[in-house]
Amino acid sequence: MNKKIFILLISLFVNFKFFSFERTITHSYEADYRLFPDTAYTEKYIKQLRGKYEVKYCVQSNIIIPKEAAKGYSCEQILKMLDQMGGLDKKCYGVSYIDYRTGERKAYFKKSSYDKNTGILYVKDKTIGGLYLDVSIDTYKQKENTYAISAILNKRPDNFFVRAIKKREAELFILLQETDDSINVYALVQSSSAPIKLKIFQKYVEGAVGGRVREIQNWFSRMICGQ
């Protein structure tokens, strides 16, 4: 068997085996929170997400991780390591993906830093370039521990092709919900800027944004599971 094909099959097997958790993902061209986990704070956060600006594009996904698989970092520990999201040399390979053509792991986020004092997260995306995000983290310790991370764009991207995305009108939202038997990892990206209404272009954007949402989730999952 060709060596590259063999490596690809092994990589995909490991990737799919690990991420065999229940996952749902949706794309919408309006505000859409149908996958938001049912928590005591759901209404609060949906109201916040809906009320900041007119949402014209929204990608959301939810993973349910069985508690017995959670052998890595705790949710609280992960929230202190957001600087590890960018770079293959970071914990759990940062936000990265397996290239289906070569079987190699490649970085979506090439660099990252997080200033806990200012709450600013910087990530260098492989295509978009540098993104600066204002991060706020809410922690709720009750029977079901819940952690909400909001990261809103604090300036327009430098990349010409995404300059239509406005300051404070695009964000990443993560919700981690710990129950007795599972951990929900909910991820959402939304923006007031929608892709051009050409089917081929929309498919490209949906693939690009959906891939990043999925791999952000996968990074949190690897951290939780210690992979």
Residue ranges and their predicted role:
Residues 4-14:
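Sec-dependent N-terminal signal peptides
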Residues 20-129:
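Hydrophobic ligand-binding cavity/cleft-lining segments
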Residues 86-89, 217-227:
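Sec/Tat-exported extracytoplasmic proteins
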Residues 127-129, 141-143, 153-157, 176-180, ...:
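Beta-strand elements of well-folded, non-transmembrane domains
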Residues 134-174:
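Hydrophobic-ligand binding "helix-grip"
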Residues 166-192:
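Compact beta-sheet-dominated globular domain cores
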Residues 214:
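Nucleotide-cofactor and metal-assisted catalytic machinery
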